[in-house]
Regions:
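Catalytic machinery of carbohydrate-active enzymes
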Residues: 1-291
Length: 291
């Protein structure tokens, strides 16, 4: 989906993710061998603000990558050739661009730094004709998701306000999307892959989503976002980048900055105190700004 990408090598790192794999000698050795066979000149390691690049840097060094750069709070020893230190308060996208620039990869003068994807397919066969608003209710971390009943109420409120609504979700979320869509919205749960989802999001007037991948994919295809943003990570670093965005949710809630996967507060107040009316008004505001 990304222009300029020639090959994708996927490896599950044992220091990342919600359920990282065990450390296996053969698995680590296999990665080092595959990278060494690629004879790569340079490696840019991109991590979020609370992650260390040094485990990856060690493996890349062992794979004989010529030059390695990353943003690192920790002293890298001989693991990094370029150690960048991010400026305080930078959005994650900007921090990544800064790190790339420190390694010599500077955007072209006309490049605004926004994520780009290859043109997605036409998806009118999925969405039907006419304008619509997308509601994406799921998230990999439950703390970042609006409760299903709230999503369903918002879908009904959007429909009552005259909007056609399309609900999206992955194959494991079909029960959720069916509940949220109800009888008033088009349910695309489990019916899109990443490319067709990009097409659905690109053609939407507005996307309503928590802090999860489709919100950032919507930004990549230029669609405004109503971001139901749990403050477990800071919105100024992680909100959708480069498009008109309205952030809803109590950013000063007790869970702020906790990085919690599950909400530590009874009733999930940071998000569930957001009302369907709040969402409708936010959608209408973004629509007004875009006309």
């Amino acid at each position: 989906m990304l222009p300029g990408v020639d090959e994708v090598l996927v490896w599950e790192a044992p220091w990342e993710g919600f359920s990282p794999p065990d450390v296996e000698d053969a698995d680590v050795a296999g990665l080092i061998r595959r990278v060494r066979e690629g004879a790569y000149d340079t490696a840019l390691i991109l991590t979020s603000f609370h992650q260390s690049p040094l485990p990856a840097a060690l493996l890349l060094r062992m794979a004989h990558v010529g030059r390695i750069g990353a943003d690192s709070r920790d002293h890298p020893g001989r693991l990094l050739d370029v150690r960048h230190r991010r400026l305080p308060g930078r959005h994650e996208a900007e921090a990544a661009l800064d790190t790339a620039a420190a390694l010599g990869f500077v955007p072209e003068p006309r490049d605004d730094g926004r994520l780009r994807v290859l043109p997605p397919p036409d998806t009118v066969g999925l969405t039907g004709n006419g304008p619509y608003v997308v509601v994406h209710p799921g998230a990999s971390a439950p703390a970042r998701a609006w409760s299903p009943y709230r999503c369903a109420e918002a879908v009904a409120a959007l429909a009552d306000a005259g909007h056609r609504v399309v609900v999206t979700g992955g194959p494991a979320e079909t029960g959720l999307t069916r509940e949220v869509a109800g009888p008033v919205a088009r349910d695309l749960g489990g019916r899109t892959d990443s490319r067709s989802l990009a097409g659905v999001l690109r053609s939407a007037d507005v996307v309503v989503s928590g802090n999860t991948g489709p919100a950032h994919l919507a930004a990549a295809v230029g669609t405004p976002v109503v971001s139901l943003f749990s403050p477990v990570v800071p919105a100024d670093r992680w909100a959708p980048y480069g498009v008109s965005t309205i952030v809803l949710g109590d950013q000063q809630a007790a869970c702020a900055g906790s990085r919690a996967r599950y909400c530590p507060q009874p009733g999930h107040p940071c998000l569930d105190d957001v009302t369907p009316t709040d969402v409708v008004l936010a959608v209408q505001k973004l629509l007004k700004e875009s006309t």
